Each structure stands twice: as C-alpha cells, then as structure tokens.
C-alpha cells in the first residue's frame, strides 16, 4: 500500500518539489529499484483476458515468462540510457505488517469469489478486473528474476526486511541517487529522491515523477519527524487508520498540533475512535530506524554479462528468441565498454535558491496532476509475442 493518498497530497501542497522527467534525463545515475514492485507491474502489464479466462505470457512449454520478459526489456532500456539499476528484493516482513498482509490475503480471496460470481453472470469486464486483483509474485518468479539479473551483470541486493527501506539506506549513504518504486513510503524511510512511474512503457508517454524530500519539507514547513507522523496518519502498512481521518484532516492536524500525540488528544473519540492496535509509536520507530543492511557493508558492482549463462537460461530453458537474447547481450556489453561521459552537474557546485513556503506561494491554477494510486499498470494491451512466447490460458 505504501502511504495512502500521499502522492496527491504532495501535488497539492508542494508541487514544486516534484519534477516531470524522461528516462534519458537520468543518464549516469545509480537507481535503487524496488524489485518486487517492478516484477508485479510486469506481470500485471502482460496479463490479459479472453473468453472468460485469464491469459498470461508463456513460452511453448507453458511456463509463465511475463516477469522475465518485462525485467529483461526494461533493464536493457535503462542501460541504453546510461542508467545504472540496482535491484533490491524484499526480505522478511516486519511483525507490524502482519495485519496488512492478512488483509491482502482476504482481499485476494474475496476477488476470487467475485471473479466466480462475474463468470456465472457472464460479466467479462468484472472478471478481468477481479483477475488482476488476484495477481501475486511467486517465490519461483522472484528466484528466476534474481538469476536473470545476475546473469546480466546487474547488482542484486537482498534486503533483510522491507526493500523500500533498504533502497532508502543506499540513497541516504550515497550508494544510489534515487529510489525507483511506486510505494511512497520510500520518502517516509528517508530517501532524499524518489522516482515514480519508472517502469511505465515508453508507448504510454507518462512522465517519470522525480520527488525531492528536502524540498517537500522546506515547502511544507514540516520536520522529518512531523512528515513521518503525517504519513502514519494518512495510512501505512504498519498500523490501521483512525476512522474519519482523511488526507486533509491529517495534514491540518500535523500542521496545527505538530505530532500524533497532540493530535490524538484533540480528537473527539466519539467521532474518531482510535483503534486499540494503532501502535503509532512502533510504526514511527520502524520508519526512523528500519531493519536494513548498512550501506557501508554492501559492495555494489556491475559486471560483464554471462553470455553462456544467459543463452542457457533464456534460450534453452525459457525458449526466448535467440536473436533477441544475443542483441540484449550486445547492448549490455556496449554499456560497459561505452566511454563514460560524466553528468554535467558533476562538474559544478550547485547552490539551491531558497523557496517560498506553501503559504506564501500562490496556488498554481489549472495545473494538471497525475492520479494517485497504489500501483501503476504498465500496459493495458498485449501484443503478439515475437520471442516464442504467447498468451496462454492460466490453469
């Protein structure tokens, strides 16, 4: 879930902290990517629906390959633009997340039931909608994704707990420039720069949102501690929401009272009963001191692609088109041997111009704002595969 409604709130309260960018603008940047989120997006993007059946991208043996197709293609696309991706995988979820995970399981089970009802009613639109809500990334898909990335020579990091927290640790310690994810809690964990919509296909023409935490804090006048409290009130993965407290009430509460403690004291609990398991202090502590591997202990290294290994895995085992794989290997080698061109901003010291506070700045009239959402669906259509892979009915 990330942080419920935070994206829209930031567009409302601190639009100047968010820049719209193209992929090519991140040339030379190391980006720590939330791997599980990316793989989920690839699976959703390549999932179709026809004649009352869910369709998945498979090879001739019937193996689902949507995660590998998406990961291979998008990683190559980033490499072509001079970006250095670092994929970070989730570890064991914290105990605070147990209720959220159980809720997700219940929602998936409910989606399965709604799918069957829609099937009986012949409602194809509802069937397709419910089918996508049941998508989960399997352990095998995670393991295969790690294998592919390592064969490509791309760094893979296993987080001890939350991937977004580990990504933020890399950014805070200078091992990466930004976190690439759809989950807004990368900012809550302290990442100084966050990129959303990084995995959207170029055909969609949706800009990448580059969000700067320091500018969010400067414009809103919030301290980092107050920002964390705001995120908890908005709704996060670790505690339930307080009933009736939406984005505007949460914003006004932190602006006026400065902390969750003081805000709760002001609440009319007959209208806003605080859940017994609203363990906000524990959630706050986790955001401020999550379980991560210290960045100093992580050796990030980009290496030569394993040509033999890639052909064995993708062509012989997964039945990818040999030409496509060989061209991909050539692109990886070209990226390593390409004469490195430094970013222009690395030659200068940049002094930031102080910005006005939100109260002093006039509202931006007529500004179009992207919709807020939990996940971004990378593609809405399935094209005929040219790599020996096809849409197959999910069994």
Swiss-Prot record:
Segments traversing the membrane: none
Binding site for Mg(2+) 1: 34, 90, 162, 164
Region (N-domain): 1-108
Free-text comment on the cofactor: Binds 2 magnesium ions per subunit. They probably participate in the reaction catalyzed by the enzyme. May bind an additional third magnesium ion after substrate binding.
Enzyme Commission number(s) of this protein: 3.1.-.-
Location in the cell: Nucleus, Nucleolus; Nucleus, Nucleoplasm; Mitochondrion
Known partners and oligomeric status: Interacts with PCNA. Three molecules of FEN1 bind to one PCNA trimer with each molecule binding to one PCNA monomer. PCNA stimulates the nuclease activity without altering cleavage specificity.
Protein name: Flap endonuclease 1
Gene: FEN1
């Amino acid at each position: 879930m990330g942080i419920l409604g935070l994206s829209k709130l930031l567009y409302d309260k601190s639009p100047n902290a968010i820049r719209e960018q193209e992929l090519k603008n991140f040339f030379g940047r190391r980006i720590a990517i939330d791997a599980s989120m990316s793989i989920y997006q690839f699976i959703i993007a390549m999932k179709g629906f026809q004649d009352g059946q869910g369709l998945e991208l498979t090879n001739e043996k019937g193996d689902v390959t949507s995660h590998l197709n998406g990961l291979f293609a998008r990683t190559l696309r980033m490499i072509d633009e001079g970006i250095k991706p670092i994929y970070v995988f989730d570890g064991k979820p914290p105990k605070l997340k147990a209720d959220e995970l159980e809720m997700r399981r219940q929602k998936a089970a409910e989606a399965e039931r709604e799918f069957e009802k829609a099937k009986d009613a012949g409602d194809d639109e509802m069937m397709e909608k419910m089918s996508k809500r049941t998508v989960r990334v399997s352990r095998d898909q995670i393991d295969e994704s790690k294998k592919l990335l390592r064969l490509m020579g791309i760094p893979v990091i296993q987080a001890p707990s939350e991937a977004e927290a580990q990504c933020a640790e890399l950014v805070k310690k200078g091992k990466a420039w930004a976190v690439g994810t759809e989950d807004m809690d990368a900012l809550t964990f302290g990442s100084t720069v966050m990129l959303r919509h990084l995995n959207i296909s170029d055909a969609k023409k949706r800009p990448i949102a580059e969000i700067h935490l320091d500018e969010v804090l400067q414009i809103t006048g919030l301290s980092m501690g107050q920002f964390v409290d705001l995120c908890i009130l908005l709704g996060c993965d670790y505690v339930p929401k307080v009933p009736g407290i939406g984005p505007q009430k949460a914003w006004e509460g932190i602006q006026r009272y400065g902390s969750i403690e003081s805000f709760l004291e002001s609440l009319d609990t007959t209208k806003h009963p605080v859940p017994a398991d609203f363990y906000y202090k524990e959630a706050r502590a986790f955001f401020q001191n999550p379980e991560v591997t210290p960045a100093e202990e992580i050796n990030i290294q980009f290496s030569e692609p394993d040509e033999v290994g890639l052909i064995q895995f993708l062509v012989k085992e997964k039945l990818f088109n040999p030409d496509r794989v060989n061209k991909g290997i050539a692109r990886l080698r070209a990226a390593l041997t390409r004469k490195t061109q430094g970013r222009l901003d690395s030659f200068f010291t940049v002094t930031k111009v102080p910005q006005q506070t939100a109260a002093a700045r006039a509202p931006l009239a007529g500004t179009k704002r992207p919709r807020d959402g939990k996940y971004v669906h990378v593609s809405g259509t399935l094209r005929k595969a040219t790599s020996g892979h096809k849409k197959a009915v999910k069994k």
